[in-house]
Amino acid sequence: APAAPVIDPVNGTDPITGTAEPGSTVTVTYPDGTTATVVAGTDGTWSVPNPGNLVDGDTVTATATDPAGNTSGPATAVVDA
């Protein structure tokens, strides 16, 4: 399975960004249970929209799934709003 993605520091407004295995599908889960998916670029970077409802102390999680269907363990980031 791929390594867990890295989530850059998260705030209440800016897009949520990070790095993962290039070409892997990153699934970001917001505190309210909704998700966003994006494919990491050739340099491994990825970005999803900020939902706009994050508050200080919320936790955002992300997993990476490689083209073979193997999913990483979760990475977490605590919102610093």
Task: Describe each PLM feature range.
Residues A1-A81:
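Ser/Thr-rich low-complexity repeats and stalk/linker segments
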